[in-house]
Amino acid sequence: MAVYIGQASIDENGGIKNGQAGNQSGRELNKSGWYSGGWTLLIRAKDPKTAEKMAKACEDGVANKNIGYDQWQRNTLRAEAKKAGWNLGAIKTPCETDCSAFMAVCAEAAGVNMDVAYTQGNAPATFQMRQQWAKTGKFEMITDKKYLTSADYLKRGDVLVNESRHTVMVLNDGSKAEQIDEKHEANKAKVKSRFELTDATVDWLDTYKYNKDLMEKLANKG
């Protein structure tokens, strides 16, 4: 099964600035088949529900012809997304983004507080994403080559990054994508409720080497 990605690519004139706001060509934001883009980093949401919401936001953004590409106006999408309650499909005012600013807005549309990732209101560029996205505590930073050189292990909602050039959103699972361990997710929820823990604490426990055994013991502790 082919894996598809969503991305902000280039303006209607084949450039990076001074185009007309909105998706004039129909390809400024677009859906494409996965390709080998020299990816150096995979950013994966720790919560599968967040990943799903990010992918849906990306699809809505690509489908909305009021959202175009312009590096000099890259943060205007964020302003309009806020006005639209983070529903990218509901944006009515022509605005602009670029590849990395688009990914950040998709994360915000999924409910992630990305304020810590921004610098004076400017979305992190590709070379800043590893450091800035990590500050939210909501994402894993993955550099295993199997995720970067093939689509097989990718999951819907993953963010692929070439840290010197480009970033895209994965829109469907690869053929060998790990399946969500529903029992483990249920144990995490039970531990959070039982011990009145914050999401951050549960996420920290989940990074422990034997996290699945630990969560099961805590969830079922007598």
For the regions a language model picked out, list residue spans one by one.
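Short beta-strand-centered aromatic/proline hotspots
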Residues: H166-G174
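Positively charged
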Residues: M141-L148
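Short, well-ordered loop/turn sites that connect or cap secondary structure elements
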Residues: L148, D152-L154
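Loop/turn positions that initiate beta-strands
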Residues: R156-D158
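Short, basic/aromatic beta-hairpin or loop at an interaction surface
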Residues: N113-M141
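Interfaces that engage single-stranded nucleic acids at replication/repair/recombination sites
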Residues: N220-G222
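N-terminal capping segments
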Residues: M1-A117, S164-R165, A177-D213, K217
